Protein backbone atom coordinates (compact mmCIF):
# COMPACT_ATOMS: atom_id res chain seq x y z
CA UNK A 1 0.00 0.00 0.00
CA UNK A 2 2.82 2.38 0.95
CA UNK A 3 4.72 1.53 -2.25
CA UNK A 4 1.62 2.17 -4.32
CA UNK A 5 1.17 5.58 -2.67
CA UNK A 6 4.84 6.44 -3.27
CA UNK A 7 4.56 5.43 -6.92
CA UNK A 8 1.52 7.66 -7.37
CA UNK A 9 3.31 10.56 -5.68
CA UNK A 10 6.38 10.05 -7.91
CA UNK A 11 4.19 9.86 -11.00
CA UNK A 12 2.49 13.13 -10.01
CA UNK A 13 5.87 14.76 -9.38
CA UNK A 14 7.20 13.58 -12.76
CA UNK A 15 4.06 14.89 -14.45
CA UNK A 16 4.52 18.26 -12.73
CA UNK A 17 8.27 18.45 -13.50
CA UNK A 18 7.54 17.90 -17.18
CA UNK A 19 5.43 21.06 -17.15
CA UNK A 20 6.88 23.12 -14.28
CA UNK A 21 10.45 23.05 -12.83
CA UNK A 22 9.33 22.17 -9.30
CA UNK A 23 12.11 19.71 -8.46
CA UNK A 24 14.68 21.95 -10.12
CA UNK A 25 13.63 24.92 -8.00
CA UNK A 26 13.59 22.76 -4.86
CA UNK A 27 17.12 21.56 -5.50
CA UNK A 28 18.53 24.93 -6.57
CA UNK A 29 17.13 26.88 -3.63
CA UNK A 30 16.94 24.28 -0.84
CA UNK A 31 18.17 20.70 -1.16
CA UNK A 32 21.27 21.42 -3.27
CA UNK A 33 21.85 25.02 -2.24
CA UNK A 34 25.02 24.87 -0.16
CA UNK A 35 25.31 27.42 2.62
CA UNK A 36 28.35 27.97 4.87
CA UNK A 37 28.37 25.61 7.82
CA UNK A 38 29.24 28.30 10.38
CA UNK A 39 26.04 30.35 10.37
CA UNK A 40 25.36 31.82 13.80
CA UNK A 41 22.65 33.70 15.70
CA UNK A 42 22.67 36.63 13.27
CA UNK A 43 21.50 34.42 10.40
CA UNK A 44 18.05 33.86 11.86
CA UNK A 45 16.69 37.26 10.91
CA UNK A 46 16.40 36.77 7.15
CA UNK A 47 13.96 33.90 7.53
CA UNK A 48 12.19 35.72 10.37
CA UNK A 49 11.67 38.72 8.08
CA UNK A 50 9.92 36.39 5.62
CA UNK A 51 7.78 35.02 8.44
CA UNK A 52 6.70 38.49 9.57
CA UNK A 53 5.97 39.45 5.95
CA UNK A 54 3.55 36.51 5.74
CA UNK A 55 1.99 37.50 9.09
CA UNK A 56 1.49 41.05 7.82
CA UNK A 57 -0.06 39.94 4.54
CA UNK A 58 -2.48 37.48 6.15
CA UNK A 59 -3.51 39.81 8.99
CA UNK A 60 -3.77 42.70 6.53
CA UNK A 61 -6.16 40.75 4.31
CA UNK A 62 -8.51 40.06 7.24
CA UNK A 63 -8.32 43.68 8.39
CA UNK A 64 -9.15 44.91 4.90
CA UNK A 65 -12.31 42.78 4.88
CA UNK A 66 -13.74 44.94 7.68
CA UNK A 67 -11.98 48.30 7.23
CA UNK A 68 -13.55 51.28 5.49
CA UNK A 69 -11.17 53.98 4.15
CA UNK A 70 -13.50 56.92 4.74
CA UNK A 71 -12.36 60.08 6.49
CA UNK A 72 -15.80 61.68 6.50
CA UNK A 73 -17.89 61.93 9.66
CA UNK A 74 -20.58 59.33 10.25
CA UNK A 75 -23.85 59.58 12.18
CA UNK A 76 -21.90 59.57 15.45
CA UNK A 77 -19.81 62.57 14.31
CA UNK A 78 -16.69 60.41 14.16
CA UNK A 79 -14.56 59.59 11.09
CA UNK A 80 -15.78 56.36 9.48
CA UNK A 81 -12.22 55.03 9.17
CA UNK A 82 -11.62 55.50 12.90
CA UNK A 83 -14.90 53.81 13.84
CA UNK A 84 -14.10 50.97 11.41
CA UNK A 85 -10.99 50.19 13.45
CA UNK A 86 -13.02 50.34 16.67
CA UNK A 87 -15.62 48.07 15.07
CA UNK A 88 -12.89 45.55 14.22
CA UNK A 89 -11.61 45.70 17.80
CA UNK A 90 -15.01 45.26 19.47
CA UNK A 91 -17.51 43.59 17.14
CA UNK A 92 -15.53 41.43 14.70
CA UNK A 93 -14.88 37.93 16.02
CA UNK A 94 -11.17 37.81 16.87
CA UNK A 95 -10.78 41.31 15.44
CA UNK A 96 -8.74 42.60 18.36
CA UNK A 97 -6.05 39.97 17.89
CA UNK A 98 -5.95 40.54 14.12
CA UNK A 99 -5.52 44.29 14.62
CA UNK A 100 -2.86 43.86 17.30
CA UNK A 101 -1.13 41.18 15.23
CA UNK A 102 -0.81 43.64 12.35
CA UNK A 103 0.31 46.61 14.46
CA UNK A 104 2.73 44.53 16.54
CA UNK A 105 3.93 42.81 13.36
CA UNK A 106 4.84 46.17 11.85
CA UNK A 107 7.21 46.94 14.72
CA UNK A 108 8.64 43.41 14.75
CA UNK A 109 9.14 43.63 10.99
CA UNK A 110 11.44 46.61 11.47
CA UNK A 111 13.17 44.97 14.43
CA UNK A 112 14.16 41.89 12.41
CA UNK A 113 15.00 43.96 9.31
CA UNK A 114 17.26 46.30 11.30
CA UNK A 115 19.02 43.30 12.85
CA UNK A 116 19.27 41.66 9.42
CA UNK A 117 20.87 44.83 8.02
CA UNK A 118 23.22 45.03 10.99
CA UNK A 119 24.34 41.46 10.31
CA UNK A 120 25.18 42.46 6.74
CA UNK A 121 27.08 45.47 8.03
CA UNK A 122 29.29 43.61 10.51
CA UNK A 123 30.06 40.70 8.17
CA UNK A 124 30.49 42.72 4.97
CA UNK A 125 27.59 41.12 3.12
CA UNK A 126 27.43 44.17 0.85
CA UNK A 127 30.88 43.63 -0.64
CA UNK A 128 31.72 41.92 -3.93
CA UNK A 129 30.06 39.79 -5.29
CA UNK A 130 26.91 40.67 -3.32
CA UNK A 131 26.40 44.27 -4.36
CA UNK A 132 23.07 43.52 -6.05
CA UNK A 133 21.88 41.54 -3.04
CA UNK A 134 22.54 44.62 -0.91
CA UNK A 135 20.90 46.99 -3.42
CA UNK A 136 17.75 44.87 -3.52
CA UNK A 137 17.79 44.75 0.28
CA UNK A 138 18.08 48.54 0.46
CA UNK A 139 15.15 48.91 -1.93
CA UNK A 140 13.16 46.51 0.26
CA UNK A 141 13.93 48.79 3.21
CA UNK A 142 12.68 51.84 1.27
CA UNK A 143 9.53 50.01 0.18
CA UNK A 144 8.98 48.86 3.76
CA UNK A 145 9.26 52.44 5.01
CA UNK A 146 6.73 53.59 2.40
CA UNK A 147 4.40 50.72 3.29
CA UNK A 148 4.61 51.49 7.01
CA UNK A 149 4.09 55.23 6.51
CA UNK A 150 0.99 54.76 4.36
CA UNK A 151 -0.44 52.13 6.67
CA UNK A 152 0.16 54.39 9.66
CA UNK A 153 -2.42 56.87 8.34
CA UNK A 154 -5.21 54.30 7.98
CA UNK A 155 -6.41 54.15 11.64
CA UNK A 156 -7.19 57.86 11.20
CA UNK A 157 -6.18 58.70 14.76
CA UNK A 158 -4.71 61.97 15.96
CA UNK A 159 -1.06 60.95 15.64
CA UNK A 160 -1.71 59.22 12.31
CA UNK A 161 -3.34 62.33 10.90
CA UNK A 162 -0.84 64.88 12.15
CA UNK A 163 2.18 62.67 11.55
CA UNK A 164 1.18 62.29 7.91
CA UNK A 165 0.55 66.03 7.71
CA UNK A 166 4.05 66.85 8.98
CA UNK A 167 5.86 64.32 6.77
CA UNK A 168 3.98 65.18 3.57
CA UNK A 169 4.48 68.90 4.19
CA UNK A 170 8.23 68.28 4.20
CA UNK A 171 8.04 67.92 0.43
CA UNK A 172 6.88 71.53 0.20
CA UNK A 173 10.39 72.54 1.33
CA UNK A 174 11.80 71.40 -2.03
CA UNK A 175 12.51 74.52 -4.13
CA UNK A 176 10.25 75.32 -7.10
CA UNK A 177 8.26 72.06 -7.24
CA UNK A 178 7.77 71.55 -3.50
CA UNK A 179 4.31 73.07 -2.96
CA UNK A 180 2.84 71.43 -6.06
CA UNK A 181 4.45 68.09 -5.13
CA UNK A 182 3.00 68.27 -1.62
CA UNK A 183 -0.48 69.00 -3.00
CA UNK A 184 -0.14 66.14 -5.48
CA UNK A 185 0.77 63.67 -2.72
CA UNK A 186 -2.09 64.93 -0.56
CA UNK A 187 -4.54 64.80 -3.45
CA UNK A 188 -5.94 67.87 -1.73
CA UNK A 189 -4.64 70.94 0.07
CA UNK A 190 -4.52 69.03 3.33
CA UNK A 191 -4.64 65.47 4.63
CA UNK A 192 -8.20 64.49 3.80
CA UNK A 193 -10.44 61.64 2.73
CA UNK A 194 -8.72 61.74 -0.68
CA UNK A 195 -5.32 61.20 0.95
CA UNK A 196 -6.71 58.35 3.03
CA UNK A 197 -8.14 56.55 0.00
CA UNK A 198 -4.99 56.80 -2.10
CA UNK A 199 -2.81 55.73 0.82
CA UNK A 200 -5.14 52.77 1.38
CA UNK A 201 -4.80 51.71 -2.28
CA UNK A 202 -1.02 52.06 -2.20
CA UNK A 203 -0.72 50.27 1.16
CA UNK A 204 -2.93 47.33 0.19
CA UNK A 205 -2.02 46.77 -3.47
CA UNK A 206 0.81 48.78 -5.04
CA UNK A 207 3.58 48.78 -2.44
CA UNK A 208 3.08 45.13 -1.35
CA UNK A 209 3.45 44.01 -4.98
CA UNK A 210 6.69 45.98 -5.26
CA UNK A 211 7.84 44.60 -1.91
CA UNK A 212 7.16 40.99 -2.90
CA UNK A 213 8.94 41.47 -6.23
CA UNK A 214 12.00 42.91 -4.48
CA UNK A 215 12.03 40.06 -1.94
CA UNK A 216 12.03 37.51 -4.79
CA UNK A 217 14.83 39.42 -6.56
CA UNK A 218 16.78 39.62 -3.28
CA UNK A 219 16.58 35.85 -2.75
CA UNK A 220 17.39 35.01 -6.39
CA UNK A 221 20.44 37.29 -6.33
CA UNK A 222 21.56 35.78 -3.01
CA UNK A 223 21.28 32.20 -4.28
CA UNK A 224 23.15 33.11 -7.46
CA UNK A 225 26.28 34.33 -5.65
CA UNK A 226 25.89 32.29 -2.46
CA UNK A 227 25.51 33.28 1.17
CA UNK A 228 28.14 35.16 3.10
CA UNK A 229 29.32 33.89 6.50
CA UNK A 230 30.74 35.27 9.77
CA UNK A 231 34.30 34.88 8.44
CA UNK A 232 33.61 36.59 5.11
CA UNK A 233 35.20 33.61 3.30
CA UNK A 234 33.92 32.54 -0.12
CA UNK A 235 33.13 28.83 0.25
CA UNK A 236 32.89 28.35 -3.53
CA UNK A 237 36.67 28.67 -3.86
CA UNK A 238 37.34 25.28 -2.25
CA UNK A 239 35.29 22.33 -3.54
CA UNK A 240 35.58 18.55 -3.47
CA UNK A 241 35.74 16.24 -6.50
CA UNK A 242 31.94 16.47 -6.87
CA UNK A 243 31.95 20.25 -6.99
CA UNK A 244 30.49 20.58 -3.50
CA UNK A 245 31.98 23.34 -1.29
CA UNK A 246 34.12 21.85 1.46
CA UNK A 247 32.70 24.28 4.00
CA UNK A 248 29.11 24.11 2.78
CA UNK A 249 26.10 22.08 3.85
CA UNK A 250 22.71 21.73 2.12
CA UNK A 251 20.28 24.42 3.22
CA UNK A 252 17.65 21.72 3.60
CA UNK A 253 17.40 20.00 6.00
CA UNK A 254 20.14 21.60 8.11
CA UNK A 255 19.18 25.26 8.03
CA UNK A 256 15.46 24.71 7.63
CA UNK A 257 15.56 22.89 10.98
CA UNK A 258 17.67 25.70 12.44
CA UNK A 259 15.18 28.28 11.16
CA UNK A 260 12.27 26.34 12.67
CA UNK A 261 13.96 26.71 16.07
CA UNK A 262 14.34 30.44 15.42
CA UNK A 263 10.69 30.69 14.39
CA UNK A 264 9.53 28.96 17.59
CA UNK A 265 11.58 31.27 19.84
CA UNK A 266 10.51 34.31 17.82
CA UNK A 267 6.83 33.39 18.03
CA UNK A 268 7.10 33.00 21.81
CA UNK A 269 8.46 36.55 22.07
CA UNK A 270 6.05 37.89 19.45
CA UNK A 271 2.99 36.32 21.08
CA UNK A 272 4.10 37.49 24.52
CA UNK A 273 4.07 41.08 23.27
CA UNK A 274 0.90 40.49 21.25
CA UNK A 275 -1.10 39.17 24.21
CA UNK A 276 0.34 41.15 27.12
CA UNK A 277 1.77 44.42 25.74
CA UNK A 278 0.42 45.05 22.21
CA UNK A 279 0.83 48.81 22.60
CA UNK A 280 4.53 48.38 23.30
CA UNK A 281 4.53 50.89 26.15
CA UNK A 282 3.17 53.57 23.85
CA UNK A 283 5.82 53.01 21.17
CA UNK A 284 4.01 50.45 18.98
CA UNK A 285 0.64 52.20 19.35
CA UNK A 286 0.74 55.77 20.65
CA UNK A 287 -1.90 57.09 23.07
CA UNK A 288 -3.01 59.99 20.77
CA UNK A 289 -3.95 57.43 18.11
CA UNK A 290 -6.80 56.22 20.31
CA UNK A 291 -8.46 59.59 19.66
CA UNK A 292 -10.13 60.26 16.32
CA UNK A 293 -8.32 62.54 13.86
CA UNK A 294 -9.18 66.19 14.39
CA UNK A 295 -7.84 68.77 11.95
CA UNK A 296 -8.61 71.55 14.45
CA UNK A 297 -6.68 70.08 17.38
CA UNK A 298 -2.92 69.53 17.21
CA UNK A 299 -1.33 66.97 19.59
CA UNK A 300 1.14 68.46 22.11
CA UNK A 301 4.00 66.47 20.59
CA UNK A 302 4.08 65.04 17.07
CA UNK A 303 6.57 62.23 16.50
CA UNK A 304 6.71 59.31 14.06
CA UNK A 305 6.64 55.65 15.05
CA UNK A 306 9.83 54.48 16.76
CA UNK A 307 11.34 52.86 13.66
CA UNK A 308 11.40 56.22 11.84
CA UNK A 309 12.74 58.26 14.76
CA UNK A 310 16.49 58.06 13.89
CA UNK A 311 15.84 59.70 10.53
CA UNK A 312 13.32 62.13 12.02
CA UNK A 313 15.93 63.20 14.58
CA UNK A 314 18.36 63.95 11.74
CA UNK A 315 15.66 66.02 10.03
CA UNK A 316 15.11 68.08 13.19
CA UNK A 317 18.82 68.39 13.94
CA UNK A 318 19.68 70.18 10.69
CA UNK A 319 18.82 73.89 11.03
CA UNK A 320 17.10 75.91 8.32
CA UNK A 321 19.51 77.71 6.00
CA UNK A 322 18.81 80.41 3.41
CA UNK A 323 15.22 80.50 4.62
CA UNK A 324 14.40 76.89 3.79
CA UNK A 325 14.19 73.58 5.67
CA UNK A 326 15.09 71.60 2.56
CA UNK A 327 18.51 70.78 4.06
CA UNK A 328 16.86 68.73 6.77
CA UNK A 329 14.84 66.86 4.15
CA UNK A 330 18.02 66.24 2.14
CA UNK A 331 19.80 65.04 5.28
CA UNK A 332 17.00 62.64 6.15
CA UNK A 333 16.96 61.25 2.61
CA UNK A 334 20.76 60.99 2.48
CA UNK A 335 20.76 59.05 5.76
CA UNK A 336 18.76 56.31 4.02
CA UNK A 337 20.45 56.46 0.61
CA UNK A 338 23.97 56.18 2.05
CA UNK A 339 23.09 52.72 3.36
CA UNK A 340 22.61 51.53 -0.23
CA UNK A 341 26.02 52.95 -1.25
CA UNK A 342 28.03 50.87 1.24
CA UNK A 343 29.45 48.49 -1.44
CA UNK A 344 31.27 51.43 -3.02
CA UNK A 345 32.10 53.38 0.13
CA UNK A 346 33.95 50.51 1.82
CA UNK A 347 37.45 50.26 0.33
CA UNK A 348 38.70 47.61 2.74
CA UNK A 349 39.79 44.19 1.52
CA UNK A 350 38.35 42.34 4.52
CA UNK A 351 34.64 41.64 4.87
CA UNK A 352 34.01 40.38 8.38
CA UNK A 353 34.35 42.49 11.51
CA UNK A 354 36.21 39.54 13.02
CA UNK A 355 39.27 40.44 10.96
CA UNK A 356 38.77 44.19 10.65
CA UNK A 357 41.18 46.62 12.23
CA UNK A 358 40.55 48.81 15.29
CA UNK A 359 39.55 51.89 13.28
CA UNK A 360 36.58 50.18 11.63
CA UNK A 361 35.49 48.55 14.89
CA UNK A 362 35.61 51.91 16.68
CA UNK A 363 33.67 53.58 13.86
CA UNK A 364 31.08 50.79 13.96
CA UNK A 365 30.54 51.15 17.72
CA UNK A 366 30.17 54.93 17.37
CA UNK A 367 27.70 54.40 14.51
CA UNK A 368 25.59 52.04 16.64
CA UNK A 369 25.56 54.54 19.52
CA UNK A 370 24.63 57.35 17.12
CA UNK A 371 21.80 55.40 15.50
CA UNK A 372 20.25 54.29 18.80
CA UNK A 373 20.75 57.74 20.30
CA UNK A 374 19.06 59.41 17.34
CA UNK A 375 16.18 56.96 17.63
CA UNK A 376 15.68 57.86 21.29
CA UNK A 377 15.95 61.61 20.68
CA UNK A 378 13.59 61.46 17.70
CA UNK A 379 10.82 60.13 19.95
CA UNK A 380 11.25 62.93 22.50
CA UNK A 381 10.23 66.56 22.57
CA UNK A 382 12.95 68.73 21.03
CA UNK A 383 14.84 70.95 23.47
CA UNK A 384 18.05 72.95 22.99
CA UNK A 385 20.14 70.29 24.73
CA UNK A 386 18.54 67.39 22.85
CA UNK A 387 18.91 69.21 19.54
CA UNK A 388 22.62 69.78 20.24
CA UNK A 389 23.12 66.09 21.08
CA UNK A 390 21.16 65.10 17.96
CA UNK A 391 23.44 67.28 15.82
CA UNK A 392 26.54 65.66 17.28
CA UNK A 393 25.11 62.18 16.71
CA UNK A 394 24.08 63.15 13.16
CA UNK A 395 27.67 64.15 12.44
CA UNK A 396 28.84 60.77 13.77
CA UNK A 397 26.21 58.98 11.65
CA UNK A 398 27.29 60.66 8.41
CA UNK A 399 31.00 60.47 9.29
CA UNK A 400 30.70 56.68 9.46
CA UNK A 401 29.64 56.56 5.80
CA UNK A 402 31.48 59.53 4.29
CA UNK A 403 34.73 58.72 6.07
CA UNK A 404 34.58 55.02 5.16
CA UNK A 405 36.58 55.32 1.90
CA UNK A 406 39.46 56.71 3.93
CA UNK A 407 39.55 54.87 7.26
CA UNK A 408 38.95 51.46 5.66
CA UNK A 409 42.10 52.00 3.57
CA UNK A 410 44.17 53.08 6.57
CA UNK A 411 43.00 50.28 8.87
CA UNK A 412 45.25 47.41 9.91
CA UNK A 413 43.35 44.18 9.32
CA UNK A 414 43.99 40.68 10.61
CA UNK A 415 44.79 37.79 8.24
CA UNK A 416 41.66 36.08 6.90
CA UNK A 417 41.60 32.24 7.01
CA UNK A 418 41.16 30.28 3.79
CA UNK A 419 38.32 28.24 5.28
CA UNK A 420 35.47 29.06 7.64
CA UNK A 421 35.97 28.74 11.38
CA UNK A 422 33.47 27.55 13.96
CA UNK A 423 32.60 29.61 17.04
CA UNK A 424 34.10 28.34 20.29
CA UNK A 425 32.06 27.74 23.43
CA UNK A 426 33.66 30.78 25.06
CA UNK A 427 32.66 33.00 22.13
CA UNK A 428 29.07 31.73 22.29
CA UNK A 429 28.83 32.34 26.04
CA UNK A 430 30.31 35.83 25.72
CA UNK A 431 27.91 36.60 22.89
CA UNK A 432 24.81 35.70 24.90
CA UNK A 433 26.16 37.58 27.93
CA UNK A 434 26.69 40.61 25.70
CA UNK A 435 23.19 40.31 24.20
CA UNK A 436 21.64 39.91 27.65
CA UNK A 437 23.41 42.97 29.05
CA UNK A 438 22.46 44.98 25.96
CA UNK A 439 18.78 43.99 26.10
CA UNK A 440 18.47 44.66 29.84
CA UNK A 441 20.34 47.96 29.55
CA UNK A 442 18.23 49.07 26.59
CA UNK A 443 15.02 48.16 28.44
CA UNK A 444 16.00 50.07 31.59
CA UNK A 445 17.18 53.06 29.55
CA UNK A 446 14.00 53.12 27.45
CA UNK A 447 11.85 52.84 30.58
CA UNK A 448 13.65 55.77 32.17
CA UNK A 449 13.29 57.84 29.00
CA UNK A 450 9.60 56.97 28.76
CA UNK A 451 9.09 58.17 32.33
CA UNK A 452 10.92 61.41 31.55
CA UNK A 453 8.92 61.79 28.35
CA UNK A 454 5.64 61.49 30.29
CA UNK A 455 6.87 64.20 32.68
CA UNK A 456 7.72 66.51 29.77
Residue ranges and their predicted role:
Residues 186-210, 214, 222, 229-232:
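Functional cores that coordinate and move charged inorganic groups
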Residues 24-44, 122, 188-195, 240-255, ...:
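Cytosolic juxtamembrane amphipathic/interface segments immediately preceding
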Residues 1-9, 232-245:
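Terminal, Lys/Arg-rich, intrinsically disordered segments and adjacent short helical elements
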Residues 45-68, 73, 80, 86-177, ...:
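Hydrophobic cores of alpha-helical transmembrane segments in multi-pass integral membrane proteins
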Residues 1-65:
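Hydrophobic alpha-helical membrane-insertion signals
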Residues 453-456:
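Conserved small/polar residues in nucleotide/adenosyl-binding loops
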Residues 20-28, 194-197, 379-389, 416-420:
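Extended, aromatic/histidine-rich regions of cofactor-dependent oxidoreductases associated
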Residues 176-187:
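A short, charged helix-loop
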